[in-house]
C-alpha cells in the first residue's frame, strides 16, 4: 500500500512539473558562405512543446556588435505576447558583415512566462558555433566564373594554334591541283 501511494504521488509530481509552457529555440545561419559586405541571413525558430501558452516571450541576441555587423532587415530583440501550445514561430534577421575573419556565433537568450503567475524562465537558443567570414576579394577569387581570365587564355593560345593552321592551309592550297572536268 505504501509503495502504491508513493508511485501515485511520484506520478502526480511529474505531471505537475510538466504543466506550463516549455520552449525549444534554435538559431541557424541560412547562408552557405558568410561574405564581408554581403547579406547574412539568420533564422530563429521557437517551438512550444508545453501544455499551455508561453506568455511575454522575448528573444534577445546581443552577439552581433554594431562595429562588426550592420542590420539590413529585421530586429535582434523581438517580443511576442503569447505562443500557443504545440505551435511555433520563426523570426528572420538579415545582417551584413563589415569585417572578414573568424566570428563566434553564440546563442541568443529567450525569456518567457511558463504560466500566468509563474516566474520568468530564461533559456538559450542553439549556437551555430564559430564560422569564417570570407573577404569579398577572396570569395570572388574562389567562386566567380573568371570570364576575363578565360578570354585572356584564349587570346594567348590563338598564335600557337592559328599560325600552324595558316601555314598548313597555304601549303595545301599551293600544292593541291584542282580536278579537271570531263565532258
Swiss-Prot record:
Gene Ontology CC: endoplasmic reticulum; endoplasmic reticulum membrane; membrane
Similarity remark: Belongs to the TRAP-beta family.
Region forming the signal peptide: 1-17
Glycosylation site list: 88, 104
Topological type in the membrane: Single-pass type I membrane protein
Transmembrane segments: 150-169
Protein name in the entry: Translocon-associated protein subunit beta
Pfam families: TRAP_beta
Subunit description: Heterotetramer of TRAP-alpha, TRAP-beta, TRAP-delta and TRAP-gamma. Interacts with STING1.
UniProt subcellular location: Endoplasmic reticulum membrane
Keywords from the UniProt entry: Endoplasmic reticulum, Glycoprotein, Membrane, Signal, Transmembrane, Transmembrane helix
Cytoplasmic face of the membrane: 170-183
Biological source species: Homo sapiens
Job of this protein: TRAP proteins are part of a complex whose function is to bind calcium to the ER membrane and thereby regulate the retention of ER resident proteins.
Entry keyword Protein biosynthesis: no
Gene: SSR2
Topology feature Lumenal, residues: 18-149
Main localization, broad class: endoplasmic reticulum
GO BP annotation list: cotranslational protein targeting to membrane; in utero embryonic development
Amino acid at each position: 500500500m505504501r509503495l502504491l501511494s508513493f508511485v501515485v504521488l511520484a506520478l502526480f509530481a511529474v505531471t505537475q512539473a510538466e504543466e506550463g509552457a516549455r520552449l525549444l529555440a534554435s538559431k541557424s545561419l541560412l547562408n552557405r558562405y558568410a561574405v564581408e559586405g554581403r547579406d547574412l541571413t539568420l533564422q530563429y525558430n521557437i517551438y512550444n512543446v508545453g501544455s499551455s501558452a508561453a506568455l511575454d516571450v522575448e528573444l534577445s541576441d546581443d552577439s552581433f556588435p554594431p562595429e562588426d555587423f550592420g542590420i539590413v532587415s529585421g530586429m535582434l530583440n523581438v517580443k511576442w505576447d503569447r505562443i500557443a501550445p504545440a505551435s511555433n514561430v520563426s523570426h528572420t534577421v538579415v545582417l551584413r558583415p563589415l569585417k572578414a575573419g573568424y566570428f563566434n556565433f553564440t546563442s541568443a537568450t529567450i525569456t518567457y512566462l511558463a504560466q500566468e503567475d509563474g516566474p520568468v524562465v530564461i533559456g538559450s537558443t542553439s549556437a551555430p558555433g564559430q564560422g569564417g567570414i570570407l573577404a569579398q576579394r577572396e570569395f570572388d577569387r574562389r567562386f566567380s566564373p573568371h570570364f576575363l581570365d578565360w578570354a585572356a587564355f584564349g587570346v594567348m593560345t590563338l598564335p600557337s594554334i592559328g599560325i600552324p593552321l595558316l601555314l598548313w592551309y597555304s601549303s595545301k592550297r599551293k600544292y593541291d591541283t584542282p580536278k579537271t572536268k570531263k565532258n
